[in-house]
């Protein structure tokens, strides 16, 4: 039942005297009246055509089935008007319908008088931001942890201020408190897991050895494989045991550091309470009051105690904890080095066995290992492959090698041709042992394009002295080869003196082009002749035949003719 009091927007304007308790009872009645008008407006909008309603008003903002609103129509039937009202977002734009002009959105025209008649003091307290605000990204710090020093007391240290103490801690600590006791429990859990791992590995080795003994066949390859696997897991068991013991030692020594932390927390709480009492005394009693002076002295003593405890705590963290984890790092380094040696030996033996049994699988496994090692090598030396793309491609495809400890050990153990390291390619010089030893063979030339190029350099045409001993040795070898061929055939033996005579006639009768070609062959193969003379036994000049001396004289004559006529006729 409605009370006799008037509303603020009552048109009658009659003022009735009501008690304060009765005025407080008017608010729910006014709320029901607004709700009735709000639902009535939604009912009227429901009879409008869909053409008049913009697209943004056709969206369902209440996908849950339980969130519905009902209104009674003229016939008393219940009608669902859930989709007739909603709260539009800031990003959506469109004409504002009467269905959204409610007291919730602040666009109700009928209640504009009520908004105007509000107390201006209440209006000033309303937030000036829009209806929908984005939540702030930063989580507020725990302001109740320490009290700020509002008055900048010179007797108080800067460490007692709220910002300097809590700014070093992340904001996630406001959601969950993590202490060294929690970290100690985690270390104990890791140590227990490590212990469980090496115990499980011991069971695995026991089972696999029992399987090997109970098997009926005796295959040497299988037995060697089981023993190699046993070595790997034995080393890993030793590694896990050492790490588990080291973690247990760290956990035991953490008790001392946890005590320091607990003491620091207690001293911080005492200092926080003293700061609160001191701040209240300054506000209510003044700074010159005796109680304020006593509290200030208490704050100073609490501050000094807190600083001493904090100093000891920092020492325990920076020195004691560092020493404990240094022992753990040393254990990792030592055991990992032993694991690398055992693993390298296993890889060498396995690849050597695959090379003899299955060549295809051997090549695939070796290529996988090489690519994985190259990826690690390239990531350490050159993170960006665009710096040297050609070098990256050559190493990746195996054209060029790279300096890797594991691959060097594998290549040294395995007997097959592999891509050498770049340093080896530069230092090694291939020997032409299979090439026939012929004076006129230009393939044996050791001159590069800049020293012996007939187009770019005149040094190519310069005369070079040929030693008679080299010619004698060369002709003697040619004679031996021809004699070996003639023995197999039934043809008559040709006199050896005919060949030098034919060469002499050709040198004298041909034109300058042929002479230049002959000179080029002689000059180019000068270094090859020197290399060949080292490999062969030396022949004394006294044992040389008369035919060899005639050939040497013919070559000297040809050399002189070349020097005189080389530039007269163009090539």
From Swiss-Prot:
GO terms for cellular component: prospore membrane; prospore membrane leading edge. Residues 23-37 have a biased composition (Basic residues). Residues 67-86, 95-121, 486-499 have a biased composition (Polar residues). Its main location: membrane. Residues 469-486, 542-566 form a coiled coil. Phosphorylated. Residues 1-53, 67-133, 482-501 are annotated as: Disordered. It comes from the Eukaryota. Keywords: Cell cycle, Cell division, Coiled coil, Meiosis, Membrane, Phosphoprotein, Sporulation. It is found in: Prospore membrane. One of its GO terms (biological process) is cell division. Involved in the pathway that organizes the shaping and sizing of the prospore membrane (PSM) during sporulation. May be required for the formation of ADY3 and DON1-containing protein coats at the leading edge of the PSMs during meiosis II. Interacts directly with ADY3. Probable component of a spindle pole body (SPB) complex composed of ADY3, SSP1, DON1, MPC54, SPO21/MPC70, NUD1 and CNM67. This is Sporulation-specific protein 1. It comes from Saccharomyces cerevisiae (strain ATCC 204508 / S288c).
């Amino acid at each position: 039942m409605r009370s006799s009091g008037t509303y603020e927007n009552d048109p009658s304007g009659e003022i009735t005297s009501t008690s304060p308790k009765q005025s407080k009872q008017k608010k729910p009645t006014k709320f029901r009246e607004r709700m009735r008008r709000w639902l009535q407006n939604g009912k009227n909008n429901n009879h409008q055509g869909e053409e008049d309603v913009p697209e943004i008003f056709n969206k369902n903002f209440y996908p849950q089935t339980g969130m519905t609103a009902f209104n009674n129509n003229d016939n008393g039937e219940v009608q669902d008007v859930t989709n007739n009202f909603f709260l539009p977002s800031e990003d959506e734009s469109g004409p504002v319908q009467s269905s959204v002009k409610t007291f919730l959105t602040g666009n109700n025209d009928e209640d504009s008088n009520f908004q105007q008649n509000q107390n201006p003091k209440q209006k000033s307290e309303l937030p000036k931001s829009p209806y929908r605000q984005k939540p702030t990204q930063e989580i507020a710090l725990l302001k109740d942890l320490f009290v700020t020093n509002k008055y900048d007391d010179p007797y108080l240290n800067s460490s007692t201020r709220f910002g300097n103490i809590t700014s070093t801690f992340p904001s996630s600590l406001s959601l969950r408190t993590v202490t060294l006791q929690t970290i100690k429990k985690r270390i104990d859990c890791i140590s227990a897991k490590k212990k469980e791992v090496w115990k499980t590995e011991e069971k695995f080795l026991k089972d696999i050895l029992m399987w090997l003994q109970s098997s009926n066949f005796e295959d040497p390859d299988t037995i060697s494989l089981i023993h190699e696997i046993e070595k790997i897991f034995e080393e890993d068991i030793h590694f896990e045991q050492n790490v588990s013991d080291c973690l247990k030692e760290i956990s035991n020594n953490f008790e001392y550091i946890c005590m320091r932390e607990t003491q620091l927390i207690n001293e911080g709480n005492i200092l926080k309470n003293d700061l609160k009492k001191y701040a209240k005394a300054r506000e209510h009693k003044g700074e010159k009051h005796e109680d304020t002076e006593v509290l200030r002295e208490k704050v100073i003593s609490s501050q000094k105690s807190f600083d001493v405890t904090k100093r000891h705590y920092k020492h325990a963290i920076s020195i004691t904890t560092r020493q404990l984890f240094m022992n753990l790092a040393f254990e990792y380094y030592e055991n990992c080095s032993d694991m690398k040696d055992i693993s390298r030996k296993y890889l060498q033996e396995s690849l050597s066995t695959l090379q003899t049994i299955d060549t295809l699988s051997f090549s695939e496994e070796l290529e996988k290992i090489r690519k994985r090692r190259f990826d690690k090598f390239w990531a350490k030396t050159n993170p960006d492959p665009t710096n040297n793309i050609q070098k990256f491609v050559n190493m990746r495809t195996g054209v060029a090698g790279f300096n890797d400890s594991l691959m060097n050990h594998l290549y040294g153990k395995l007997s097959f041709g592999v891509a050498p390291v770049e340093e080896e390619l530069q230092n090694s010089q291939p020997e032409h042992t299979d090439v026939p030893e012929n004076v006129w063979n230009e393939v044996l030339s050791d001159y590069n394009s800049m020293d012996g190029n007939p187009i770019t350099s005149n040094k190519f045409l310069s005369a070079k002295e040929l030693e008679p001993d080299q010619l004698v040795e060369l002709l003697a070898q040619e004679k031996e080869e021809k004699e070996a061929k003639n023995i197999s055939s039934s043809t008559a033996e040709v006199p050896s003196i005919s060949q030098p005579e034919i060469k002499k006639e050709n040198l004298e009768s041909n034109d300058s082009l042929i002479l230049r070609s002959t000179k080029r062959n002689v000059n180019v193969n000068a270094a090859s002749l020197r290399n060949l003379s080292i490999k062969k036994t030396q022949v004394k000049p006294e044992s040389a035949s008369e035919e060899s001396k005639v050939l040497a004289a013919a070559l000297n004559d040809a050399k002189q003719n070349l020097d005189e006529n080389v530039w007269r006729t163009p090539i």
